Amino acid sequence: MKRYATFFLSILLLAALTACGSGSSPSGKDAPPVRTPMGTKDTEQTSDLEQAYSDLVERFRTLVSDPFGQDSDEPGEMGVLETARGMGDDAPYEMGYLIEDLSGDGIPELAVGGLRGMTNALYTLVDGKPELVFEGWYRSSYVYLGDGRFYYYGSNSAAESGQGVFALTKDGTRLECESFLFTGLNSDGDVVVYSNETGSWDIAESEKSDMTAEEFWALDPLGEPLPLIPFYGAEAG
């Protein structure tokens, strides 16, 4: 594999790069609200923070249990519904949630998605209330890599696909790009791979990579699926 492919895969395997600028923020916020992390992780504090997600968990349980009987255009719910409808009757068994501190600031996040990898929605708490960090669906998906990092795969068209590593900010309110690759057509109509560290799909803001399209499509980073609790059988709040 050529030089850039080796470099990019090293990022995925070692996760050693520091976070870059905030040019790709799914939440669209330039200055997230100030949060107060837990000082002491005792059982009572943790329980209170987790309880803040109880209504959301039950909402997602309802969507997953009867996806064809529900409809929603609410950010955070559309990707969950899409995945649940694709799974049909298996959705309550194959989808779940996890309340865990993924950013490392002492405040737990809520992740919802498939047990086998894709995260459809991620929330954190701001001023004690759930706030959507990002949403994933079939053509714009996120898989957990570990250490607060997610691998992104998306597609805008047959010729435009993107892959990259994004990390949660320390306060957990948004994602920051570490490395991003995407394909586009050059003036001759050939598929070319471009790279940047902002998450931009704009060729003018990117550099041409020496990675071939075949190498791009062959990228297969090892994810670390979150240990989600299936909605079926989980204790209702």
Features from the language model and the residues they span:
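Positively charged n-region of N-terminal signal peptides that target proteins for export
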Residues: 1-9
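C-terminal motif of bacterial Sec signal peptides marking the signal peptidase cleavage site
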Residues: 16-19
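Acidic, small-residue rich beta-repeat scaffolds with periodic aromatic anchors
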Residues: 23-66, 153-237
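Blade-edge motifs of beta-propeller repeat domains
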Residues: 39-92, 129-141
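Beta-propeller blade termini
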Residues: 93-102, 141-149
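Acidic/hydrophobic-patterned starts of short beta strands in beta-sheet-rich repeat architectures
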Residues: 103-113, 148-152
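Loop/turn residues immediately N-terminal
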Residues: 116-121, 159-163
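Beta-propeller blade repeat segments, especially FG-GAP/WD-type strand-to-loop junctions
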Residues: 120-133, 168
